[in-house]
Amino acid sequence: MRKVMKPMKDVGIVGYGAYVPMYRIRNEEIGRVWGVSSFPIEEKAVPGLDEDAITIGIEAARNALKRAKIDPQKIRAIWFGTESKPYAVKPSATIIAEAIGATPDLEAADFEFACKAGTEALQAAIGFVGSGMAEYAMAIGADTAQGRPGDHLEFTAGAGGAAFIVGEKSNESVAYFEGSYSYVTDTPDFWRRQHEHYPRHGNRFTGEPAYFHHIINAAKTLMEELGLKPSDFDYAVFHQPNVKFPLTVAKILGIPKEKVLPGLLTGRIGNTYSGATMVGVSAVLDIAKPGDRILWVSFGSGAGSNAFSIVVQDAIEEKRDLAPKVEDYVKRRKVIDYALYAKARRKYIL
């Protein structure tokens, strides 16, 4: 049985865009409040009072449209992956579609699968375009991640997102998909029940049986099915709940950390959950050369991984400067203290 997934038509990325909120809180500041002196990252992005997963998705989608240079009316599906949607009952994707001028002739839906909701939406978009049902489809991954005050998640739960517009592979594609693979099991490593404010996690259980098991199996299977070796890739982007985990995966797979660091942003903006690997791949596309091959592996608790192999095309040279780059957003920062952070994240629950 063939495990790798390939659509009937070759599919490429015609436009991509990212967005990261301006505000930052240093891990040192969080540690000062909770009496902690060792930190997993340097700082994380914090959404403003008027920002949420939808507004982040809109900004990313607009940047993707700038690079795609297409009429938004040609987009026949907008699928939005998040685990922090503002409405419990009401789709977020419809708001994004309206904001970018893509309504009314399209599919729209919200996807959920913890931190791989965005790449789950991307898998669907590839299939939708690859089957011939649509000329273009957009997949978005964005989150304003939450962590219980004082919990170790609070040090890393960031905010940000990215959008990818896919279409049939052509000279207008900045990159194309060689194939993809998904690996899923029922692993309860991280969850949040209805009406609870903050997620719960299985501490160390989130590592070996969850994150590492799924990402490594997804990456190895994809490479085996495509006949590729770790040395065939110029860059690798793995889900990044912290800085340590993706570098450990790279070491296990035999990929030098120099190929991982360009897309490893968690240390500076935090774990953007559904946006994590999508923002990371956007950062890599901002600097990649035509012909470069990128290994892209997401992870979502519950648990599963999506793995993609993409190859950069000539159009990247023209299109990457048509919208703000990831590094532009990372450098655009204003540091705030814990009091303002707690207000912005609505941690004062009355």
UniProtKB/Swiss-Prot annotation:
Pathway(s) it belongs to: Metabolic intermediate biosynthesis; (R)-mevalonate biosynthesis; (R)-mevalonate from acetyl-CoA: step 2/3
Catalytic activity: acetoacetyl-CoA + acetyl-CoA + H2O = (3S)-3-hydroxy-3-methylglutaryl-CoA + CoA + H(+)
Residues involved in CoA binding: R204, K244
Positions annotated as active site in the UniProt record: E83, C115, H239
Key words of the record: Acyltransferase, Isoprene biosynthesis, Transferase
CDD domains per the UniProt record, alphabetical: init_cond_enzymes
Enzyme Commission (EC) number: 2.3.3.10
Gene Ontology biological process terms in this record: farnesyl diphosphate biosynthetic process, mevalonate pathway; isopentenyl diphosphate biosynthetic process, mevalonate pathway
Coiled-coil residue windows: none
GO MF entry, a single one: hydroxymethylglutaryl-CoA synthase activity
Keyword Protease (UniProt): no
Binding-site list for (3S)-3-hydroxy-3-methylglutaryl-CoA: C115, T156, T206, H239, N271, S301
Biological function: Catalyzes the condensation of acetyl-CoA with acetoacetyl-CoA to form 3-hydroxy-3-methylglutaryl-CoA (HMG-CoA). Functions in the mevalonate (MVA) pathway leading to isopentenyl diphosphate (IPP), a key precursor for the biosynthesis of isoprenoid compounds that are building blocks of archaeal membrane lipids.
Family per similarity comment: Belongs to the thiolase-like superfamily. Archaeal HMG-CoA synthase family.
Listed PANTHER family: 3-HYDROXY-3-METHYLGLUTARYL COENZYME A SYNTHASE, HYDROXYMETHYLGLUTARYL-COA SYNTHASE
Subunit structure, as described in the record: Interacts with acetoacetyl-CoA thiolase that catalyzes the precedent step in the pathway and with a DUF35 protein. The acetoacetyl-CoA thiolase/HMG-CoA synthase complex channels the intermediate via a fused CoA-binding site, which allows for efficient coupling of the endergonic thiolase reaction with the exergonic HMGCS reaction.
Protein name as annotated: Hydroxymethylglutaryl-CoA synthase
Origin species: Pyrococcus furiosus (strain ATCC 43587 / DSM 3638 / JCM 8422 / Vc1)
Lineage: Archaea, Methanobacteriati, Methanobacteriota, Thermococci, Thermococcales
